Amino acid sequence: MGRSRKKGPYVDRKLLEKIRKLNETGEKKVIKTWSRASMIIPEMVGHTIAVYNGMKHIPVYITENMIGHRLGEFAPTRRFGGHADKKAKKGELKK
């Protein structure tokens, strides 16, 4: 179940303040945030936001296609090591 429309999208207050300040001055700086749950709003388009994935900050450039999604969707938290090689498995079974 999603968030109620009457409440509006959740955006971290401090993150929103930083975005608005950069929009007023016209600066383009990378903004570090730990708020993965914040929704991307039209004011953020064109900015680069470094989203924390539990280990480091991943820079995410915000485009119009991302509006309505959460910041955390663009900074994966898990590493995929890959599936085991089938040839290696067969060789182990024969020995």
Swiss-Prot record:
GO terms for biological process: ribosomal small subunit assembly; translation. GO terms for cellular component: cytoplasm; small ribosomal subunit. InterPro entries: Ribosomal_uS19, Ribosomal_uS19_bac-type, Ribosomal_uS19_CS, Ribosomal_uS19_SF. Gene3D superfamilies: 30s Ribosomal Protein S19, Chain A. Residues 82-95 have a biased composition (Basic and acidic residues). PROSITE patterns: RIBOSOMAL_S19. SUPFAM superfamilies: Ribosomal protein S19. The keyword rRNA-binding applies. Coiled coil: none annotated. Residues 76-95 are annotated as: Disordered. One of its GO terms (molecular function) is structural constituent of ribosome. It comes from the Bacteria. Keywords: Ribonucleoprotein, Ribosomal protein, RNA-binding, rRNA-binding. Belongs to the universal ribosomal protein uS19 family. HAMAP family: Ribosomal_uS19 (MF_00531). NCBIfam families: rpsS_bact. Protein S19 forms a complex with S13 that binds strongly to the 16S ribosomal RNA. This is Small ribosomal subunit protein uS19. It comes from Thermotoga maritima (strain ATCC 43589 / DSM 3109 / JCM 10099 / NBRC 100826 / MSB8). The gene is rpsS.
